[in-house]
Amino acid sequence: LSPGGRLRRISLEWHAPAPSGLRPAIAVNGSGDCRVTEGRRLIYGTDGRAEALEVLSADLADVVFREALNPPVPAGPPTAQGAVRVAVIDTGVNYTLPLFAGRLARDGAGGLLGYDFWDMDARPFDVDTARSPFFPLHHGTAVTSIVLREAPGAVILPYRYPRPDMTRFGDMVAHADRAGSVIVNMAMGSNAEADWRAFAQAAKARPHMLFIVSAGNDGRDLDKTPVYPAALGLDNILTVTSADADGRLARGSNWGASRVDVMVPGEQ
């Protein structure tokens, strides 16, 4: 609804029966006058997981665009010895993009180092369905591209964070440690300290690893109203906030005299 109460758009979802219960199948979006503007349909594989999202035309007859949700990892050569391995814990990475060819950490057989701790498989593809299965977000790919731009000599270990079970964070940190990563980028956070207990325990046990975490963008003082893991207070956590082009705190960025360590340009 608009501020004046006028209907601006409408969205309908249909969830279909599946062996594990109802699962999202199709969404139809319409304008304020109830005309269909597009449809979105999820395609499932034999394992019951969504493998593609199809965007449909207004009459729902044609597929306008098809987005893969869990494609195979392309083959690649083993990682060169001595390359700095940076773990990016986020929503995954779109490893099918040419941008990342040769920049993802791999073992001696060419297998991708990294893991999907959300779906618990070896395909950490960038899909965040937390808000809607029909409108997934792709935060991790953007973050990873920035890391590679700023650190051209690094290779990436992509991880998809364990939203269904945050206790898996302990296993994820251990996985990154075994894979040879001592730098971990985590542009994420939440208000619930309990969500981060497994991470805190694993990080504290590994002082040789540095975890670079975002302060967040809620426009608040973390010393008074904390966000985690930024406010965990571990010696091997570096909490970073954003500056604008003039070197001032960027609009909406969090701050904190004791909780935030560094402010860097982050608006461009």
What are these regions (language model features)?
Residues 90, 109, 227-268:
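Extracellular S/T/G-rich loop segment that most often corresponds to the catalytic His/Ser-adjacent loop
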Residues 138, 142, 158-236, 246:
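Substrate-binding/access-modulating region of protease and related hydrolase catalytic domains
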Residues 5-87, 91, 97-99:
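Protease zymogen maturation seam
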Residues 78-81, 149-151, 177-178, 204-206, ...:
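Extracellular/periplasmic catalytic domains that process cell-envelope and extracellular macromolecules
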Residues 94, 123, 149, 162, ...:
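Active-site/binding-pocket entry motifs
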Residues 70-154, 171, 175-182, 246:
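Active-site core segment of subtilase-fold serine proteases
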Residues 87-89, 115, 157-159, 212, ...:
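Hydrophobic/aromatic beta-strand patches that form the interior of the parallel beta-sheet core
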